[in-house]
UniProtKB/Swiss-Prot annotation:
The keyword RNA-binding applies. NCBIfam families: PRK00136.1. This is Small ribosomal subunit protein uS8. The gene is rpsH. PROSITE patterns: RIBOSOMAL_S8. The lineage of its organism: Bacteria, Pseudomonadati, Pseudomonadota, Alphaproteobacteria, Rickettsiales. GO terms for cellular component: ribonucleoprotein complex; ribosome. One of its GO terms (biological process) is translation.
Amino acid sequence: MSMTDNVADMLTRIRNAYKSKLINVSFPSSKIKTSILEVLQKEGYIKNYTSTPKDNISYTEVTLKYSANGDASICEIHRVSKPGKRVYSAIKDLKGYYNNMGIYILSTPYGVMSDREAHIKNVGGEVICKVF
């Protein structure tokens, strides 16, 4: 089976793992996925992630984060910019997602970063996904 949107597949696997109350989730690695996971870890949405080779393919295993009473740290995670319809935004057009309780993840000329970091660097770019 060929996949056209690997990032959407990763986000769906993470969303489904949280719904199933799993501790870990794994999927094939790529540079963009690793960059997105780095932002999610820096913002406190996941515990950690590791890349391991399996059968000549590198897989990433993500350890999900839950609160003390078992609530997921991610309520919603959705793809915004898709292969068929790219979404770009200037930094002045990005308002705080869920009253600044959530984040947008952007691909900018300076790398993949959250909207908060993009505001500090005053740079816009492609809106990859939104997380709350």
